[in-house]
């Protein structure tokens, strides 16, 4: 079973995210549980929690179909201790909010060394940050997203993801989300079925499909290997349709949220319908 949706707005209340996902006939969705560009947010009220859970139940979204995303401000590998602590506290708050909402996943960008510490030290800090957050929360898996590698962002190599996972003590509560645009921009070819087979064979060898907890399905305005993060609508960018057809026909991507972050929300319903239509020839 493929769960397909988009990163929808939670404007006006978290329950609205589930409603908006249902309106585009999604079977999965992503959301921010707070303003993603602010450090602090008011605690979730009992009413907000109840309304969100009721909306998810009404529209048949289980926890495994929802992939919340944390704030863009958080840097779990920050080289400066004070800023690192601020990020860690904010991440624990994000995990706690997910726990309160009955959600089991939290997607996040791993972190940046800001040209101040070596890659290895930054990756170790990220793993330590995850360990701290997991120790203070229950039931929520930390889902590391691969990046395009802009600036000093880490996570653009599968080896980075593997190194972080290696440093996490509770392997049952860590996973990854692969963003197709980010992977392509980082130098992983996805332009044909053959290229996808090779890229995901590398992923299986280095990270392992057992850790795959979600996907972001985005075409790329950015060019191959450019390390530039620019999303595009499916089939309109430099990746093309073949990659997304291949994913929809491969059972290894079953049972996880497949989330659009493409640039035109007005055609999300069409993109979801197109993706669903590709399953007709699904192969085991």
Swiss-Prot record:
The keyword Signal does not apply. The keyword Transport does not apply. Its EC number is 3.1.21.2. Binds 3 Zn(2+) ions. It holds the Pfam family AP_endonuc_2. Its cofactor is Zn(2+). Disulfide bonds: none annotated. GO terms for biological process: base-excision repair. Keywords: DNA damage, DNA repair, Endonuclease, Hydrolase, Metal-binding, Nuclease, Zinc. It catalyses: Endonucleolytic cleavage to 5'-phosphooligonucleotide end-products. Zn(2+) 3 binds at residues 182, 229, 231. HAMAP family: Nfo. This is Probable endonuclease 4. It comes from Klebsiella pneumoniae (strain 342). The lineage of its organism: Bacteria, Pseudomonadati, Pseudomonadota, Gammaproteobacteria, Enterobacterales. The gene is nfo.
């Amino acid at each position: 079973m493929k769960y397909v949706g988009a990163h929808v707005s939670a404007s006006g209340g978290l329950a609205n995210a589930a409603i908006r996902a249902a309106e585009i006939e999604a079977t999965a969705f992503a959301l921010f549980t707070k303003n993603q560009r602010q450090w602090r947010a008011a605690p979730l009220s009992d009413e907000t929690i109840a309304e969100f859970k009721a909306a998810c139940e009404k529209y048949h979204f289980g926890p495994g179909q929802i992939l919340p995303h944390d704030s863009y401000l958080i840097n779990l590998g920050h080289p400066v201790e004070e800023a690192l602590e601020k990020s860690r506290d904010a991440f624990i708050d994000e995990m706690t909010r997910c726990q309160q909402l009955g959600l089991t996943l939290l997607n996040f960008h791993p972190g940046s060394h800001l040209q101040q510490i070596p890659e290895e030290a930054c990756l170790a800090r990220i793993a330590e940050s995850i360990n701290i957050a997991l120790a203070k929360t229950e039931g929520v898996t930390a889902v590391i997203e691969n990046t395009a590698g802009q600036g000093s962002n880490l996570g653009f190599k599968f080896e980075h993801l593997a190194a972080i996972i290696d440093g996490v003590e509770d392997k049952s509560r860590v996973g990854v989300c692969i963003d197709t645009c980010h992977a392509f921009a980082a130098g992983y070819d996805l332009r044909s079925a053959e290229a996808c087979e090779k890229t995901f064979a590398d992923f299986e060898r280095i990270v392992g499909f057992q850790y795959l907890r979600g996907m972001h399905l985005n075409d790329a305005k950015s060019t191959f290997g450019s390390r530039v993060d620019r999303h595009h609508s499916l089939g309109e960018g430099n990746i093309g349709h073949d990659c997304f057809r291949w994913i929809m026909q491969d059972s290894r991507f079953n049972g996880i949220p497949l989330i659009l972050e493409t640039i035109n929300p007005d055609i999300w319903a069409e993109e979801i319908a197109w993706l669903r239509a590709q399953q007709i020839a699904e192969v085991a």
